[in-house]
A protein has these predicted regions:
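Multi-pass, polyprenyl lipid-linked donor-dependent membrane glycosyltransferases
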Residues: 36-39, 99-107, 123-162, 175-178, ...
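Membrane-interface transmembrane helices that cradle and orient dolichyl/undecaprenyl
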Residues: 87, 117-120, 158-180, 188, ...
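Hydrophobic, aromatic-rich transmembrane alpha-helices
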Residues: 107-110, 206-207, 213, 284-324
């Protein structure tokens, strides 16, 4: 394959993204789970790595609390659809768990470049790839154990495959892009179902248009994409049946009965249920956080987006509008979910990140007088007009430098030891003297849940690790639990007194 100079630069940016994400995972998040979601994903991944979707519920299930891992009819299983846990489980099985999201980060940057190159030309593709690489929003999520980097790759791959075969002006007769489009959207549905609906929506409108106005061959490809993605998405129903015994029982509702998409009583935590007022508050705050975390330019991360939209409309670039519509669709559809997500930026919109980086790249190129269409020639300027691109480069350089020197380091540092959870919390159990106590049941007496949650990094779902950790439920329940593990010594642990193990509850506790 012949690579252009721009392709090689994009490849370097993609490799830098892998390195940057790995460093964030290692230096900021210390390769341990912090969010409840991450803990649950790891639990599922470890179970799947050994071939299990469900496990028998342990004795005293509340003692072995794992967030978002459900006990139902004597079985224990995670509430999340299988897409991301399976991929993470492959990483666990191969011993490369900590590399999965960094590798996906690099692939996400590469696919963003490919989308930009296809729709707007190499210059915009490189701008979008560079903006992605320097985005605090991108770096935080790429260093996490969350599903969003996988979702971004699937979303971008779907958009690229759709445009390869069905985009305006496409003449490709090949079946491969059709298969890839169906598979990637279907896998996204197996990973983040509501996100898949939102990502697919702009393309669904285009697909309906093609069904009415396209030739028979085009219609076949549209129907094939829809059929493949729906067939894969329907596997969620089989998974629900496998773990709950009911095709239509969503495991989310077994943890919180109100954890559903929709409005009214029974949706969300308020008595009256989710409503448009709450939706507006959530959305507004998500966007407020988002336009700071997007590029780290303070309140001005959005500054080039209007010019990008203007350029797309002037050039009547309908492919660009479709791709740009992904983030708008995500914002619109997540109005129907009762809670927002802000700690890692507005991560429910993450799978549409390329919409924002591409449109920002188009805006920059448009203002600088650079090409914003594939194969468009570079214009030469004379006189004062020569200052136009130089001024844009200077402004962009200033913004990116300010982000990399100030905003991103501060933002990432704010995530270190999130919720007070650090790898140092595990050290009391890794000393030679502690290892001599194993195998042991450790009953944890935490001041807050996170003091217990961080220790789950040393435990697996099968409870066959040197130490297994139980959340104290009171002296009687703790004693009964200890009797269920006669082959293990029992110790009581107080996180505010590390390196000290008690053979019974501490005096005065």
């Amino acid at each position: 394959m012949n690579m252009s100079r721009a392709d090689r630069i994009a490849l370097i940016l993609s490799l830098l993204a892998v390195v940057a994400a790995f460093l964030v995972a290692d230096r900021i998040f210390e390769n341990i789970a912090h969010l409840e979601d991450e803990i649950a994903y790891l639990w599922q991944a470890q179970a799947i790595a050994r071939g299990d979707l469900t496990l028998p519920s342990p004795p005293h299930p509340h003692s072995f609390l794992v967030p978002f891992v459900v006990d139902h009819k004597g079985l224990r299983f995670g509430k999340y659809p299988l897409g991301w846990p399976v991929l993470l489980g492959i990483g666990v099985r191969l011993g490369i768990r900590n590399l999965i999201n960094p590798l996906l980060a690099g692939l996400g940057v590469w696919l963003t470049y490919r989308l930009g190159k296809k729709i707007f030309g190499e210059a915009v593709g490189l701008l979008a790839a560079g903006l992605t690489l320097t985005s605090p929003f991108f770096l935080m999520n790429s260093g996490s154990l969350l599903s969003h980097p996988f979702g971004l790759v699937l979303s971008a791959a779907f958009a690229l495959a759709w445009l390869d075969r069905l985009g305006p002006g496409s003449t490709s007769p090949e079946i491969l892009p059709t298969i890839v489009a169906g598979l990637t959207l279907g896998l996204l549905a197996l990973t983040r179902p509501w996100t898949a609906v939102a990502v697919g929506l702009p393309f669904a409108f285009h697909g309906l248009y093609l069904l009415f106005r396209g030739d028979w061959e085009t219609r076949r490809h549209v129907l094939a994409v829809g059929g493949i993605s729906l067939a894969l998405g329907a596997l969620n129903l089989l998974w629900q049946y496998a773990v709950t015994g009911d095709f239509l029982l969503n495991p989310y509702t077994l943890w919180w009965s109100y954890d559903k998409i929709g409005f009214g009583p029974g949706y969300g935590i308020t008595k009256s249920g989710h409503n448009l007022d709450i939706a507006w508050i959530n959305t507004r705050f998500s966007l407020f956080v988002g336009y700071r975390d997007l590029f780290g330019w303070g309140a001005y991360s959005w500054i080039f987006l209007p010019f990008g939209l203007l350029a797309v409309l002037i050039k009547r670039n309908w492919r660009g509008l479709m791709v740009g519509g992904v983030v708008a669709s995500l914002i619109l559809l997540y109005v129907a979910y009762w809670v927002g997500a802000w700690l890692y930026g507005p991560r429910y919109y993450y799978e549409g990140l390329y919409s924002l980086t591409l449109f920002s790249g188009v805006g920059i190129a448009f203002l600088a007088g650079w090409p914003v269409q594939p194969d468009a020639p570079w214009k030469s300027y004379s006189g004062w007009w020569q200052a136009r691109p130089l001024a844009l480069v200077a402004v962009l350089g200033l913004l990116v430098s300010a982000n990399l020197l100030f905003y991103t380091p501060l933002r990432l540092q704010s995530m270190y030891g999130l919720y007070g959870m650090e790898r140092a919390d595990l050290q009391p159990f890794l000393t030679p003297s502690a290892q001599k106590l194993a195998p042991a049941l450790v009953i944890v007496h935490p001041d807050q849940w996170m003091d217990y949650g961080v220790l789950l990094s040393l435990e697996d779902p099968f409870l066959d690790t040197p130490f297994i950790f139980a959340y104290t439920q009171g002296s009687k329940a703790d004693a009964d639990l200890a009797s269920k593990f006669p082959d293990r010594a029992t110790y009581h642990y107080y996180p505010d007194k590390p390196y000290t193990f008690y053979i019974g509850p501490a005096p005065g506790s």
